[in-house]
């Protein structure tokens, strides 16, 4: 075997890793909101702003109309200043105010502003909640969570982080204070033996605990008693005024027509129906009408019912005798459903009808 050379180093120096921490504050970023006309007729002015006042590296430009249409998504908590470009003379103020009066624009804009960031206009000014000379724009900004700034515009407030604070009732401290309050003579005694004038020289036990304290000590643990006769020293008059509900409505209110909700109005060609949770009285009125209609139908039906003594057999074989309808002899086509001559052929009034061998003989 041919000899070989080991070229790996025998000395391994320790390797150290250096970690650099960047504690520098975040870079200030600015968002410029431009009306649509500024993009078509203000290219030179935008170039001047980027070269003189707002560096392009830390400045973003968005169009107000695209933001209002929801075509732009802004990064969250990014901008320290949101500047609405309206020209120093305010020539584009009305155009920008018309777009910022939409609540959806502020809903997309405010989350992109950092805590403590400002929303201002290029022309400045504005008192109170007025922004771009329009109270509506300022109202929408306040409803979105901004507060009016002192130098015009609005500021996003810095809210402190929520922190849970435990509630301690100090039961241990109260128990320690009660134990320290006991005198050095020992614990309190409940009864003592003393000689009285009526005891004839004998000592009697006398209670040293007040009755109220003794009753409270005799109560079981965890059970409380409420004295409903105690008014807690509140100045409450016994003769409280009770409002009569019948006096809340006047005669004019009672005669006023009921305003029918739109959902209760019947559709064309359909019968009016009441809602499940009807409160206008339509359901009760329709129920009363149904009951009255059913009662009338029952009464009409009872008038048509005949008793057993009224159902006398009518002899059609006698000349001149006819049924109540007068058409029994004409045939089944003219007979009632309960006619006893159903199935018989037509015959003449007074004609004798015989049945021989289950065959009808006229």
Curated annotation (Swiss-Prot):
A motif (Cx2C motif 2) lies at residues 336-339. GO terms for cellular component: mitochondrial intermembrane space. Pfam families: CIAPIN1, DRE2_N. It is found in: Cytoplasm; Mitochondrion intermembrane space. [4Fe-4S] cluster binds at residues 325, 328, 336, 339. Keywords: 2Fe-2S, 4Fe-4S, Cytoplasm, Iron, Iron-sulfur, Metal-binding, Mitochondrion. The keyword Mitochondrion applies. Residues 15-28 have a biased composition (Low complexity). GO terms for biological process: iron-sulfur cluster assembly. One of its GO terms (molecular function) is 2 iron, 2 sulfur cluster binding. A motif (Cx2C motif 1) lies at residues 325-328. Monomer. Interacts with TAH18. Interacts with MIA40. Component of the cytosolic iron-sulfur (Fe-S) protein assembly (CIA) machinery required for the maturation of extramitochondrial Fe-S proteins. Part of an electron transfer chain functioning in an early step of cytosolic Fe-S biogenesis, facilitating the de novo assembly of a [4Fe-4S] cluster on the scaffold complex CFD1-NBP35. Electrons are transferred to DRE2 from NADPH via the FAD- and FMN-containing protein TAH18. This is Fe-S cluster assembly protein DRE2. The lineage of its organism: Eukaryota, Fungi, Dikarya, Ascomycota, Pezizomycotina. The gene is DRE2.
């Amino acid at each position: 075997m041919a000899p070989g050379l080991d070229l790996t180093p025998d000395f391994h120096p320790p390797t150290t890793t250096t970690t650099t921490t960047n504690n520098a504050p975040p870079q200030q970023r600015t968002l410029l909101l431009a009306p649509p006309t500024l993009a078509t007729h203000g290219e030179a002015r935008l170039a001047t702003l980027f070269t003189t006042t707002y560096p392009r590296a830390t400045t973003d430009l968005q169009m107000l109309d695209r933001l209002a249409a929801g075509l732009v998504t802004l990064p969250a908590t990014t901008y320290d200043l949101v500047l609405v470009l309206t020209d120093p003379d305010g020539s584009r103020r009305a155009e920008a105010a018309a777009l910022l009066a939409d609540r959806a624009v502020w809903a997309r804009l405010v989350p992109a502003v950092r805590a403590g960031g400002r929303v201002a206009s290029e022309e400045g000014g504005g008192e109170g909640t007025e922004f771009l000379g329009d109270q509506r724009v300022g109202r929408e900004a306040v409803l979105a969570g901004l507060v009016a700034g002192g130098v015009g515009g609005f500021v996003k407030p810095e809210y402190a982080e929520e922190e849970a604070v435990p509630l301690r009732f100090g039961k241990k401290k109260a128990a320690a204070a009660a134990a320290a309050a006991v005198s050095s003579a020992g614990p309190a005694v409940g009864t003592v033996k003393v000689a009285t004038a009526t005891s004839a020289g004998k000592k009697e036990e006398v209670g040293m605990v007040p009755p109220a304290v003794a009753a409270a000590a005799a109560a079981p643990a965890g059970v409380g008693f409420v004295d409903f006769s105690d008014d807690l020293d509140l100045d409450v008059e016994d003769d409280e005024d009770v409002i009569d509900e019948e006096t809340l409505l006047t005669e004019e209110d009672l005669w006023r027509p009921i305003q029918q909700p739109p959902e209760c109005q019947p559709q064309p060609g359909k019968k009016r129906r009441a809602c499940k949770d009807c409160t206008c009285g339509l359901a009760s009125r329709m129920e009363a009408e149904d009951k009255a209609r059913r009662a009338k139908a029952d009464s009409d039906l009872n008038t048509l019912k005949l008793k057993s003594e009224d159902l006398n057999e009518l002899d059609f074989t006698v000349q001149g005798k006819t049924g109540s309808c007068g058409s029994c002899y004409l045939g089944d086509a003219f007979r009632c459903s309960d006619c006893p001559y159903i199935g018989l052929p037509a015959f003449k009034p007074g004609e004798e009808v015989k049945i021989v061998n289950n065959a009808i003989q006229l």
